[in-house]
Amino acid sequence: MLVIVLQGLAGFLSIIAILCQKRYNKLHRSIYGLSYDLFLLDFVGNGLYLYCALHYCYSSLVREQLSQRFPLFYPLNDARSIPISSFLILKDFCVSCCCMMVLRQLYYYRSTKHIYQGISITSIIIISVFLVLGIFTYGCSISNLPLKNSGKFGVFYLEHINYLWVMANLLKCFKYVPQMSINWMGCSTVGLSSKFALISFLAESIDLLGRLVIPTNALFYEIPFNSTPFWVKLIQFVTLLVILCQVQYVYVGRKPRLPKGKL
């Protein structure tokens, strides 16, 4: 599918954007004005996407339950019936690795952060709630195995994977909001690479326009499970547009004015 190819291209551009931000941090030996939450949410979101995609590919239990629920769409005797894109798996893995490198810089250059930087309480609460829900659904889904192919409270192992997929999309769709807020609180975008903002916006534009313009004959059950939903890309596009306006127009030339934060 051409749309999947464009998603892969957008992912490749996202990797370039993150590497540009990494280089910017290294050149300035500073992470002043850069959101911790942006790269944390992106890392966790892509990690969950990988977890779900690999289970859809290789978990016989997931494939069996999916086949029992939708036998016409995903027959058990057809190993290729569950649509998963290996290209997108590779993309998510590479993005996760790049985010990890920037997170390492955020720790290494932590002495240069200002008072509003750091992992926010909001992100900690959201990720903690998702972690508890993930552990709870996992425990419910395996409680009756291997005697029964079902879990407590009607939570099958397939539900556990599906819930994590929803959580991953929620984390990914709002990942740029913390950076937008940091820029607003500091009235500056000094810590954000203009190349990162521009290339990221270009990546989301290509992906979004590809879905809107290019016709597709794929039926709903043929769309790869690890393909990012349209509504996630739309929210990312809007928030990136705001950040790009902050970088290019609203806070252009503004100098940093906030004091350094605590280590």
UniProtKB/Swiss-Prot annotation:
Keywords: Membrane, Transmembrane, Transmembrane helix. It comes from the Eukaryota. The keyword Transmembrane helix applies. It is found in: Membrane. GO terms for cellular component: cytosol; membrane; nucleus. The chain crosses the membrane at residues 1-21, 38-58, 82-102, 118-138, 151-171, 196-216, 230-250. This is Putative uncharacterized protein YCL002C. It comes from Saccharomyces cerevisiae (strain ATCC 204508 / S288c). The lineage of its organism: Eukaryota, Fungi, Dikarya, Ascomycota, Saccharomycotina.
